[in-house]
Each structure stands twice: as C-alpha cells, then as structure tokens.
C-alpha cells in the first residue's frame, strides 16, 4: 500500500512539473514567433507586394495563410490572419469563423507540390495541439504525414468508428482518443471544433484541454480524433503525436 501511495505521489509531482514546463514554454517571447511571421511578414508582404513570402499562400479575404514548417520536408501550417491563440478560443465555435480544418485539408496540395508528385490522401493527416500541448500561442493546424503505425491502426478500426464520438479501441500512442466518422459534405458544412463542442459532454467548457486531428479513410470518409489533457497519464493532448514529419509512409 505504501509503495502504491508513493507511486501515485510521484505521478502527481511529474504531472505538476509537466504542466509547469508547458506553461513556461507558452509565456516566453518565442511563443509568439508564428504570430509575428503571419502578422508582420506574410500578410503585409501580400497586401503591399502581392507576394506571400515567407508564407506559401496568403488569403486575406478568406482569413488564413499557409506556411512551410521548418520541421520535416513536407510539413505545412495553416494559420489565421488574425489573433486566435488556440483550441480554447470561443471564436472556433462561432459559425462565422472560417472552417479551418476544411481549409487545411485543401492545403495538403502544398505537400504534393513540394514532394514533386501526388501525396496519397491516406498518407496525410491534420492536427492541432491543446493549450498545454503546444509551443506557440498562435492557432496553427499541422498539415503533415501520418505515422505508419497510426495509419494501420485506423485502417483496422474502420468498422468500429461511427458517426458518434466514441472511444477508439486501444487509443493511439498510449493515450485515449475519441473518434468520429464524418463525410466530406458534413465537413464542408460544419467545423470539427463545433462538432466536438456540441456533441461531447462538457467539451465546450474545456476546449483548450483538447487536441484534435483528422485523417481520411479508405472509404473516402474522414475520421476526427480528439484527445483530452490528462496529466496523471502524462497526456498533454498533443494530437500532433499521430504525425510523422519525416514521412516514412511515403518511402
């Protein structure tokens, strides 16, 4: 019993330290790097010179930019042209806010252009990390390759994923995930952030504790994946963990 109590105490200490490290990362100047690139470089250059650089694309009227990430050969980031910190923002459950996940899915074309040939949809994944699972304080969706082991696990669970948010059998990467199947027409009409907030009990009040990902399945449907922060299990809700920025799946 004493050993069990000690182990529990150690886990709590580790969780508190992890939370503290996450907070420290988000309070430094470097946490504003992406926001400065968008607002001080990409957007002004597009508006003044019709040149999106250093971004790959700037769409002021649509409210987003696409930027090549330095990590990995094919990873891109989709970001808003205005201030949104992350998943905790109430703007993401406002119907007037752009459907950033759908826009990010269109942004996968940049991966193919960079690769020099079409990147199969089955190799692509989108992910956004929770408030404690990110290092930047500007909303950004990672557009990158999926890990081969995650791809295989989702393929094997195709029949078990329904149109309701349900626990994914076995979770992913050692963490619990909710999974929901959506059609392309559903995705076009409704943001995954709204689906999560409106369909998962108490999610709306705790959106910042969730990481969210999206993957296409072999039947052309999409799977939404949501993981919630749980520091006792060392889960910071970094949905980016399902991605492989080195793109082994293409080799």
Curated annotation (Swiss-Prot):
Q: Where in the cell is it found?
A: Cell inner membrane
Top-level class of the enzyme under EC nomenclature: hydrolase
Q: Which is one GO molecular function term here?
A: CDP-diacylglycerol diphosphatase activity
Superkingdom of origin organism: Bacteria
Q: Which UniProt keywords apply?
A: Cell inner membrane, Cell membrane, Hydrolase, Lipid biosynthesis, Lipid metabolism, Membrane, Phospholipid biosynthesis, Phospholipid metabolism, Transmembrane, Transmembrane helix
Annotated metabolic or biological route of this protein: Phospholipid metabolism; CDP-diacylglycerol degradation; phosphatidate from CDP-diacylglycerol: step 1/1
Can you quote a single GO CC term? plasma membrane
The annotated topology with respect to the bilayer is: Single-pass membrane protein
The EC number(s) attached to this protein equal: 3.6.1.26
TM region positions: 4-24
Mention one GO biological process in which this protein takes part, according to its record: CDP-diacylglycerol catabolic process
**Which reaction does this enzyme catalyse, per its entry?**
a CDP-1,2-diacyl-sn-glycerol + H2O = a 1,2-diacyl-sn-glycero-3-phosphate + CMP + 2 H(+)
The record's section on NCBIfam families has: cdh (TIGR00672), PRK05471.1-5 (NF003986), PRK05471.1-6 (NF003987)
- Indicate the family of this protein: Belongs to the Cdh family.
> What protein name is recorded for this chain?
CDP-diacylglycerol pyrophosphatase
Organism listed in the record: Escherichia coli O7:K1 (strain IAI39 / ExPEC)
